[in-house]
Structures are given as structure tokens and as C-alpha cells.
């Protein structure tokens, strides 16, 4: 790190300023300022969201003096993975960072009506949750660019005096013209009553905006709305991010997203030090304390090695992202699922199918749209692979290529047998794909898909489903949830009244929130105080020791010995603050479990690999042996890549056997239920 005198009065904006004051400060700045995504999107894009607050908080003292516009440290998938894997509460993270970097605006990423989940929530849930979260900058996007869906979030955020950052989801397509984007910006400006209290973000989540295109778009927006402050969020996947950032800045963008150079891999964002140098060499001043930025980059190097295991197996930049458009934030989780499902070798075919699919069903591949795309397209490829092997995978990619690229999606121009095959293409698509077609997320950017897509997804009921399709925003079509009933249900489940923050976690992710609460009741603040290597692997050898502080007191734990297993019990000897203690640890012996597969007409199998997160449905609750179910009724739900996949009764029947339990991991085709016709 170079020795350099620290800049004085480098803080441009800070918590407590009004939105008008923040916008005015950025607007009057000569050059650009920066948002660091090092505490959130860097981890989501290249490290499976596994970066722990234990390590990230070490950057806070540098951020506090760096002169950042904001630090994106909250929201997106970090919220969910936090409670599910890292066992950290997003509320804890805010509290820790508020204390350590009081000069920095804390920024979240929120998915309009989907909040920090993957489905639309009712208006009263949105208003309740948004009013309780202590965040300064609310970046809000819609994967459909349906600005109507932002209304509830915008109203609460602006009423609270926090900065609302409405966001355009950006892609490159024949329909994604300047005229289209200007119409979205107009809707945003109308929603927010002008440009004085907002900052507009352009979210290039896949990194597909070429140098000319992004500069042209920002120039068009600035010509129409010269006072509008613009921020550019741009992933590096295509390898052309830095010149695109420069093009955006030259066209009038005021803020750019960056991350520590030492965090940069393949799917995240551009390196902060390199961007600062590149911009200033190009004549654009950058508001940044370079000394503190260098220190932050170096601090990351001290702990990033603990996360090598979380990096994507798909190495290198990928300019073909301009075709398949998988967003940077979805790469690691998609590859993780492909590895676990043993279909990583099919990734080239899946990405090819995605590039064709996104011309048939047009929306933006960003959460939850990216999960819908991934589960749908990977499901198609895996089904053909299972039924026909590699030849089947080649066949389905060629079929789609012929339909999209050669026949220009003229269904009638395809051969009869090809038409029949297309009409089965989406028959096993996930429930969220079907919800998308039914308008349950909002309206698609440039209209609904062709009728054959509905025939393919819904079979004989396609015409009925089109008539049921919603044109309203979920804010207007969903009824309110009974919050007190939900709170009471959580209290009954955990055996006490939930804290306010626990209830909000539950509203977002009921199953995972309950598991989080149980875990933290058992293990306390261990996720916050244990070093990352110990958190992940524990103390492995006699003599291994960990030192930490808890509530201001020092603790030391040393592993002395691990005894032999006897009847499923192992005695572990530890020294805790030099006092020897013996712990009896249950270690159930692994039992070989036979996986039963569905083979008969009255046996219902899993349509995909996933986790059983509901048995029954919200309307009737859990179902059990002996219950009567009706044709078309949901009898269970599997989760895969954060998407719901409803299991539907094929006919009126009685449940003869329930073959799985909640939270079981199941394989495609595995037996879920045995039913008998009634």
C-alpha cells in the first residue's frame, strides 16, 4: 500500500441527510462517486453468498473514511442465504455496520413486490416489512420493469425520509430500445413525483451493455431528464465492464458500482482501484480516498482464502453471456446446483437453451426471473438427457434453434411432429413459470408469449388459463395477509412470542426462518464470533484452539481429544478457558436408505431434484394418510433454486401413503405419495 496523506473532509454523503440533500450533493459533484458492492453483490456473484459478517466488518473502518456514495451490504439473496447457511440475521448485520461505519449510507437491494423473497407479497406485508428495516438507500428493481409493482416500497421509503433508488433492469434485445427504456423512466419519474428525491439505477445484471449501447442509453435519458442522477450497476462477465463504465460516466452517469480488486473474479464487478485510475487517466475525477481504498483491498487478502471452496467451477470471463444473459448473481448458485445434481457437463447446452428461451418468453433474467429461467431450461435439458442421453440434449437444442432462428418463431412453419414436441416442451415446467404466464408477478415487458407456450404449459386447460391471466399488479390483485394469525402461528411453532425481527424473517422465508431461530437458540452468537475456518470446519486435531470475544469477555476453546464412537455417542474432551469439560455428542451412524421410485399410475414422483418444504397446501394445511384430495389440488411443494414447484393430484383420490417428510431432499422420480382413486 502506498504511503499517501489522507484526504480531509472526504465524506460526500452520510446517514441523516435528506434525499434532497443527497441528490443535490451528488448532482453538484465534479466527476463521479462510487458504491462499493464488496459487502453484498461481490459475494453473491462469485462466492455463493458465503462471505460472513465476521470478515466483512473488517472493511468497515476503511469504508467509513473512503468517501463512498454508499455500501451495498444488505438484501438480494444475501438475506436468504444469511439465515439459511451463514446463520446470520440481516438485522444483526445492519446493527454491526451502523456502529463501525457511521459515515456510510447503507444500501439494500429489494425486488419490489417480491421484497427479499421470490414471490409477490401482499401490500400490507410489504408496508409492514419495509417500515421496520433501518436502511438508507433502497435500490428497488422489477424483473419485468413493471413500475406499478414498486409503488408500495416507494411510498413507505419516501415517507420515512430515506432515499429511494428505482432501478431499470437492462438487457440487449431487439425490443429493448431507447424508446422502451424512456417509457420505463417516465413511469418511474411519475411514480416518484419528479427527479429531486431519487437516484435512477441502470441494472446491467448480466454485463451485456456494450460500450456504445450504454452510453447511448444514458445520453438519451439525460437529454430527457437532465437533472436526474444516474447510477450504473454493471457486472464484468463479458470482459468489457471497465470501458462500459467509462462510457456511462462520459454520457452523464454520476455513480458507478465497484468492489475490492482482491474480490474480483469473473461474475461480479470492476475493481475499485483500477476504475479510479482508469477514469482519472481519461479525464474524469473520482471522489475517493485512494489510501483507504488500498487498505480495504489489502484487508480482503487476509481472509479471502477461506472462501476458495465457494468459487464457481466455471472459470473465466464469458462473452457468450451476451446471448444467454445469465446474471452474475445467479452463476454461482446455478453451478452449485448443477454440481450437486451431477449435470455440470450439460451447462453449455443449458446456456444455449436459455439464449433461445429468452426470445420466446421475454423478461429480464434477474431474481426471481433468473431462477425461473434456470429451473425451466435446466429442467428441459435434463429431461431430454434422462430420456435420450446426449443425443436428446443435442436434439432439443437443435429443435429450439430451428424454431427461433430459422423459422422466426412461426409455429405453423414447423413440421407436425416438431409442433407436437414443442407443445410438450413446458409441460413439466415449474409452478413459478406458470405463475409468470398467468400474470401473478405482473405484466411482461413487451406482452404475453404466443398461445403455443400456454398450450405447452397447461395442456387442454390453456384457453381457460389465458382467460384467468391477470393484468393487474400483484399489489392490486393480492388480498392482505392476516399478520396477527401468522405471528401467532410462529409463536406456537417456536414456543414463545417471536421478536419483531424474527417475525419479519418468518414473513420472508417461513421454513428457513424457523430453522434459523432454532439454530440460534441452541448455538447463540457462534456465527458472529467464530473465525471462518473454525466456523466451517471446526477444531479437527488435538491441540487445535480458537480464541474469541463474546459480549466483551475473552474465551478460549481447545480440543483435547475425541473418543471412540459407542452406540452412536462420542465423548469429546475440550478445554474451555482452561477448564476441562467432557461433552457427549450424538453421531447417528449413517444408514443406507433405499430410495423408492414412482413406477405406477397411482404413485406420484418428484418432477425435479429439490427439497420438500410443504406437504399439503396453504388452504387446507398439512395432508396425511386417509385424506381425500381432488384433481388439480396441490398436495406438496418442492423447492429448487428458490423456486416453488407444486405437486398436483392427478385425479380425485385418497392418500394411501406419504413417503417423504418435511425438509427431505428428493431426487427426480422419487416416490412422494401413493394414492388410490375415489
Locate the predicted segments by residue.
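Active-site-proximal beta-alpha loop/turn segments in soluble metabolic enzymes
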Residues: 40-46, 79, 166-176, 198-210, ...
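N-terminal capping/small domains of soluble enzymes
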Residues: 1-121, 125, 132
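Terminal or standalone catalytic/regulatory effector modules within metabolic enzymes
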Residues: 36-44, 58, 62-82, 313-321, ...
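Catalytic alpha/beta core domains of metabolic enzymes, predominantly
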Residues: 205-398, 415
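Structural recognition of alpha->loop->beta junctions
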Residues: 61-68, 124-138, 182-202, 247-256
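Structured functional modules or segments
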Residues: 595-678
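Hydrophobic faces of well-ordered beta-strands that scaffold small-molecule active sites
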Residues: 34-39, 69-73, 104-112, 136-139, ...
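Active-site beta->alpha loop and helix N-cap motifs at the rims of alpha/beta catalytic domains
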Residues: 75-186, 206-209
Amino acid at each position: 500500500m502506498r504511503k499517501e496523506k489522507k484526504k480531509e473532509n472526504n465524506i460526500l454523503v452520510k446517514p441523516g441527510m435528506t434525499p434532497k440533500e443527497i441528490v443535490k450533493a451528488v448532482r453538484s459533484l465534479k466527476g463521479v462517486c462510487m458504491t462499493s458492492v464488496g459487502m453484498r453483490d461481490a459475494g453473491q456473484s462469485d462466492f455463493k453468498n458465503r462471505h460472513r459478517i465476521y470478515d466483512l466488518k473488517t472493511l468497515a473502518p476503511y469504508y467509513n473514511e473512503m468517501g463512498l456514495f454508499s455500501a451495498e451490504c444488505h438484501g438480494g439473496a444475501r438475506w436468504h442465504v444469511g439465515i439459511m447457511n451463514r446463520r446470520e440475521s440481516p438485522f444483526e448485520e445492519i446493527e454491526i455496520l451502523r456502529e463501525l461505519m457511521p459515515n456510510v449510507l447503507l444500501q439494500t437491494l429489494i425486488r419490489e413486490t417480491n421484497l427479499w423473497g421470490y414471490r409477490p407479497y401482499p401490500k400490507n406485508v410489504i408496508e409492514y416489512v419495509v417500515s421496520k428495516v433501518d436502511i438508507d438507500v433502497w435500490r428497488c428493481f422489477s424483473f419485468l420493469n413493471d413500475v406499478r409493482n414498486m409503488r408500495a416500497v416507494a411510498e413507505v421509503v419516501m415517507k420515512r425520509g430515506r432515499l429511494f433508488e428505482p432501478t431499470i433492469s437492462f438487457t440487449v434485445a431487439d425490443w429493448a430500445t431507447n424508446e422502451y427504456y424512456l417509457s420505463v423512466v417516465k413511469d418511474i419519474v411519475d411514480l416518484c413525483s419528479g427527479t429531486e428525491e431519487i437516484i435512477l439505477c441502470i441494472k446491467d445484471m448480466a454485463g451485456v451493455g456494450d460500450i456504445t449501447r450504454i452510453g447511448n442509453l444514458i445520453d438519451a435519458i439525460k437529454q430527457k431528464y437532465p437533472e436526474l442522477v444516474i447510477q450504473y450497476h454493471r457486472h464484468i462477465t463479458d470482459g468489457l465492464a471497465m470501458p462500459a463504465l467509462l462510457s456511462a460516466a462520459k454520457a452523464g452517469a454520476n455513480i458507478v458500482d465497484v468492489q475490492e480488486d482482491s474480490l474480483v473474479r469473473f461474475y461480479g464487478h470492476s475493481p475499485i482501484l483500477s476504475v479510479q485510475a482508469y477514469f482519472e487517466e481519461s479525464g474524469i475525477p473520482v471522489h475517493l480516498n485512494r489510501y483507504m481504498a488500498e487498505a480495504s483491498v489489502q484487508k480482503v487478502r487476509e481472509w479471502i482464502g477461506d472462501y476458495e471452496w465457494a468459487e464457481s467451477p466455471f472459470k473465466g470471463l464469458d462473452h457468450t453471456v451476451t446471448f444467454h444473459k445469465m446474471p452474475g448473481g445467479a452463476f454461482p448458485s446455478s453451478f452449485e446446483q448443477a454440481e450437486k445434481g451431477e449435470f455440470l457437463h450439460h451447462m453449455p447446452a443449458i446456456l444455449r437453451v436459455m439464449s433461445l428461451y429468452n426470445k420466446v418468453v421475454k423478461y429480464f433474467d434477474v431474481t426471481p426471473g433468473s431462477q425461473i429461467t434456470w429451473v425451466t431450461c435446466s429442467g428441459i435439458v435434463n429431461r431430454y438427457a434422462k430420456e435420450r442421453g446426449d443425443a436428446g440434449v443435442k436434439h432439443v437444442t437443435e429443435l429450439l434453434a430451428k424454431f427461433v432462428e430459422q423459422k422466426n418463431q412461426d409455429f405453423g412453419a414447423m413440421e407436425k411432429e416438431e409442433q407436437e414436441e414443442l407443445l410438450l416442451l413446458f409441460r413439466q415446467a415449474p409452478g413459478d413459470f406458470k405463475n409468470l404466464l398467468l400474470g401473478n408477478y405482473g405484466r411482461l415487458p413487451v406482452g404475453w408469449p404466443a398461445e403455443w407456450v400456454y398450450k405447452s404449459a397447461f395442456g387442454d386447460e390453456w384457453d381457460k388459463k389465458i382467460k384467468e391471466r391477470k393484468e393487474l399488479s400483484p399489489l392490486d390483485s393480492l388480498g392482505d395477509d392476516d399478520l396477527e394469525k401468522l405471528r401467532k402461528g410462529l409463536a406456537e411453532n417456536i414456543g414463545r412470542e417471536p421478536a419483531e425481527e424474527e417475525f419479519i424473517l418468518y414473513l420472508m422465508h417461513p421454513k428457513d426462518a424457523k430453522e434459523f431461530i432454532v439454530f440460534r437458540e441452541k448455538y447463540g452468537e457462534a456465527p458472529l464470533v467464530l473465525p471462518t475456518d473454525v466456523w466451517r470446519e471446526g477444531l479437527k486435531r488435538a491441540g487445535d484452539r480458537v480464541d474469541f470475544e463474546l459480549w466483551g469477555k475473552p474465551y478460549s476453546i481447545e480440543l483435547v481429544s475425541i473418543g471412540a464412537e459407542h452406540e452412536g455417542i462420542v465423548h469429546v474432551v475440550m478445554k474451555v478457558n482452561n477448564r476441562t469439560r467432557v461433552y457427549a455428542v450424538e453421531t447417528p451412524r449413517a444408514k443406507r436408505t433405499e430410495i423408492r421410485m414412482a413406477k405406477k399410475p397411482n404413485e406420484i414422483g418428484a418432477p425435479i431434484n429439490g427439497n420438500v418444504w410443504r406437504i399439503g397446501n396453504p388452504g387446507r394445511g398439512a395432508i396425511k394418510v386417509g385424506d381425500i384430495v381432488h384433481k388439480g389440488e396441490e398436495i406438496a411443494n418442492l423447492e429448487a433454486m428458490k423456486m416453488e414447484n407444486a405437486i398436483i393430484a392427478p385425479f380425485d383420490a385418497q392418500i394411501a401413503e406419504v413417503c417423504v417428510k418435511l425438509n427431505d431432499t428428493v431426487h427426480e422420480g422419487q416416490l412422494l405419495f401413493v394414492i388410490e382413486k375415489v
